[in-house]
Swiss-Prot record:
Source organism of this protein record: Glaesserella parasuis serovar 5 (strain SH0165) (Haemophilus parasuis)
HAMAP family the UniProt entry points to: Glu_tRNA_reductase (MF_00087)
UniProt KW keywords: NADP, Oxidoreductase, Porphyrin biosynthesis
Protein's gene: hemA
CDD domains per record: NAD_bind_Glutamyl_tRNA_reduct (cd05213)
Catalysed reactions, semicolon-separated: (S)-4-amino-5-oxopentanoate + tRNA(Glu) + NADP(+) = L-glutamyl-tRNA(Glu) + NADPH + H(+)
GO biological process: one example: protoporphyrinogen IX biosynthetic process from glutamate
Protein name: Glutamyl-tRNA reductase
Membership in a protein family: Belongs to the glutamyl-tRNA reductase family.
Major enzyme class: oxidoreductase
Entries under NCBIfam families matching the protein: hemA (TIGR01035)
Active-site residues annotated for this sequence: C50
Documented EC number(s): 1.2.1.70
């Protein structure tokens, strides 16, 4: 059995590559279907955010040893599929992608969910994104009449519990540090007084909600929201309890013409704000400074807009400097969190081994019971035919002993051949032998 984590993130790939491998709209559904049809995994969870795209495969038929030929072939098959679904050159992808298996994969997932692998150390939004990814996987497999495999499901439930423990036992989440906070911090570096600015927020998801809260906390009073669905933007305005002008995406130009600061975070696969739209807005605004912050992957704002005069344009990658300033205070807490992750990942694999041994014992007992019933049936038949009782019982006990010991004997021979000293010692101890 093998659990494989495969993907890229902000540490290994640029925004341009990350946006190419984002699972947007129907691509996620196609991925689930292709993985099922190609038997790549019994279950998979697809995590796709601004800063990472990762897939967590569970394949019980693949041996866990990374050097095993079947394991190597399977990894290559998964990589080839990943490149193909995104129509990427394998050489380009191979420079940025990574894979982790079993214990290492469990540690990685837990680290991701705890915010230890995030662009902003300890940011809390990623946990919600991991939960959403798991929920989408559950929905797909339930639609197929099954569910996420027991082992992969258990790993994610353990991950959620670990993240909760990290939040409660460390100070990693004590300060409001996130992508949204970094975007707000960038705006404060360029503009002094938020009370006099007009903000245009594009999108109405969790990240934009956090951006809006940070802006309001720093004095913003004039906020516009543009979103694909009017009702969702309206709900956000009610939630934030502040009057906001709500625009449709088709009316983005109206908002741009008025905005000093534009912050975008949607799931759109296409550019929403072009260079020409910004140029037109600047003419309306008499070329007053405008800040464009695009925290969406794929991009919402044409990167060429940053070439215009009086425009300050930043992408997710450009937030790195602000983020670095906030990392130092979380390093100590992160070290504590890493210890918790190591402990919990180890605990998960203890459970996994117990589960595997329980299943093994169950199957062995079932096999033994089948042997017993088969030999008993033959013995009873022999007795009914008038054969000597003692002879029948001797034959029954002899065959029963031989057949029941056949599998353990093979296992012992395999352990000796593979130099499995611990296994042999455990068996010897169970039999109360000296050596």
């Amino acid at each position: 059995m093998t659990i494989l984590a495969l993907g890229i993130n902000h540490k290994t790939a640029s925004v341009s590559l990350r946006e190419k491998v984002a699972f947007v709209e129907d691509k996620r559904q196609r991925a689930f279907e292709q993985i099922r049809d190609q038997s790549l995994a019994e279950s998979v969870v697809i995590l796709s955010t601004c800063n990472r795209t990762e897939l967590y495969f569970h394949q019980p038929k693949i041996p866990p040893q990374e050097e095993h030929p079947d394991n190597i072939a399977w990894r290559e098959q998964c990589f080839n599929w990943f490149a193909e679904i995104h129509q990427l050159d394998k050489e380009e992808l191979s420079e940025a992608y990574y894979f982790k298996q079993n214990l290492e994969a469990a540690r990685h997932l837990m680290s991701v969910a705890c915010g230890l692998d995030s662009l902003i150390l300890g940011e809390p939004q990623i946990l919600g994104q991991v939960k959403q990814a798991y929920q989408e996987s559950e929905e797909f497999y339930h639609s197929q009449g099954s569910g996420v495999s027991t082992n992969l499901s258990r790993l994610f439930q353990k991950t959620f519990a670990t993240a909760k423990r990290v939040r409660s036992e460390t100070e990693i989440g004590s300060s409001a540090v996130s992508v949204a906070y970094a975007a707000c911090g960038l705006a404060r570096q360029i503009f002094d007084d938020f009370t006099k600015l007009r903000f245009l927020l594009v999108g109405a998801g969790e990240t934009i909600e956090l951006v809006a809260r940070h802006l309001i906390n720093h004095g913003a009073k004039n906020i516009m929201i543009a979103n694909r669905t009017h009702i969702r933007a309206e709900m956000l305005a009610v939630k934030l309890d502040i009057p906001m002008q709500i625009l449709s995406l088709s009316a983005l130009q109206i908002g741009l013409n008025q905005a000093d600061v534009v912050i975008c975070s949607t799931g759109s696969p296409d550019i929403l704000i072009t260079k020409e739209m910004v140029e037109q807005a600047q003419k309306q605004r008499r070329f007053d400074p405008m800040l464009l912050i695009d925290i969406a992957v794929p991009r919402d704002i044409d990167e060429k807009a940053g070439e215009l005069d009086s425009i300050y344009a930043y992408s997710v990658d450009d937030l790195q400097n602000i983020i670095q300033q906030n990392i130092a205070q979380r390093q100590q807490a992160a070290e504590q969190a890493k210890e918790i992750v190591i402990e919990e990942a180890k605990d998960f694999f203890v459970w996994l081994k117990q589960q595997q041994s329980t299943n093994l014992i169950k199957h062995y007992r079932q096999n033994a019971e089948e042997i017993r019933l088969d030999l008993l049936e033959k013995a009873l038949s022999a007795l009914q035919q008038g054969q000597d009782c003692e002879k029948v019982l001797n034959e029954l006990s002899y065959k029963l002993t031989n057949q029941l010991l056949h599998i353990p004997t093979q296992a012992l021979q395999a352990m000796a051949k593979n130099s499995n000293v611990k296994g042999l010692q455990s068996f010897s101890k169970a039999l109360k032998l000296e050596e």
